Amino acid sequence: MPYFPDVDRVRYEGPDSDSPLAFRHYDADKLVLGKPMREHLRMAACYWHTFVWPGADMFGVGTFKRPWQGSGDPMELAIGKAEAAFEFFSKLGIDYYSFHDTDVAPEGASLKEYRHNFAHMVDHLERHQQQSGIKLLWGTANCFSNPRFAAGAASNPDPEVFAYAATQVFSAMNATQRLKGSNYVLWGGREGYETLLNTDLKREREQLGRFMRMVVEHKHKIGFKGDLLIEPKPQEPTKHQYDYDSATVFGFLQQYGLENEIKVNIEANHATLAGHSFHHEIATAVSLGIFGSIDANRGDPQNGWDTDQFPNSVEEMTLATYEILKAGGFTNGGFNFDSKVRRQSLDDIDLFHGHVAAMDVLALALERAAAMLQNDKLQHFKDQRYAGWQQPFGQSVLAGEFSLASLAEHAFANELNPQAVSGRQELLEGVVNRFIYA
């Protein structure tokens, strides 16, 4: 029995369509810069917000009445949830999905039950993937929801909790490998602290470093060819999280010699919480050589928490996509919709409305970003702005041919008196707007 009987496969109808169940801009096989849209964007729907979240919040119980979320045998419900998920993915026309281990299988009362349940559901997911052609963008382990992880997983003061988390990550990595996932994500949901009064920062950082090295070792042992991705977030649920932002993650990776092994999965809403723009986080990761993938959503700038709304700003997503295209596009990553409908969006059809609109936003942003790249006025301006560093003097400074003292002598001898030059910010903002609102 279908879970979404009133929805046909969502199709491209063009900009003049007024149907909320049709794409106006996302034409999956349309070529952009010589590559189909679907291959540029590599869009994924997430399991947790779409099929697990019951519509609960801090002040109230769940508002949704999803048929796959009723009472009954947990394994039967998990099987039904998988059937609903792949019906949704197929009708939406999205190519990828993502999950946590405990999204797809009941956790059970012991590790033995966990292993049995998860293995059983991986069998089901594999069959659904083969039948539908839908692929796994990434898998991960939920090492934050169970009360045992209240003080963290890898950073926990109890080594047995560390071992329990390692077991889940071991299992989820193996499942991701079997399901031919493109990436494996490590989100440190509670890897942080509530108060420094009971926290040993150095010890917890060393534990995290040891854990990540074990993950890297296991990746190579099982022959996983995808990327390992840390997902930065500054706070929530903890007061302070150790993977605060892209720059912080890079510093951590360098400390433990992992900067060539692990990249970042950047979430728009997490950038907001860190006081950064989404554009900033992507540009920073690209500049550091650790850009991997994207969690596509948005936060509310007036709220200090993770609202995980669907992306709806073509302007924001154009700048993000421009930065990604300039870096060569996704390798293994993609745009994963870590987004959820609002608590008052009660109907199953709302799941389609949110995803369809967001997919159109990304498609339009891709076209605008491609146009910016083809006539790259921003890069032309940057080349001119930094041109002095390409001249012999600038090159010799960068090459280490001057000491601080000899550089000062050079300035005195040549009576240097450089003048400020306009940064042309307003001009460049106008240039961007002309591409976006063409």
UniProtKB/Swiss-Prot annotation:
GO terms for biological process: D-xylose metabolic process. It catalyses: alpha-D-xylose = alpha-D-xylulofuranose. SUPFAM superfamilies: Xylose isomerase-like (SSF51658). GO terms for cellular component: cytoplasm. Binds 2 magnesium ions per subunit. Mg(2+) 2 binds at residues 267, 270, 306, 308. The active site is at 100, 103. The keyword Translocase does not apply. GO terms for molecular function: magnesium ion binding; xylose isomerase activity. Homotetramer. This is Xylose isomerase.
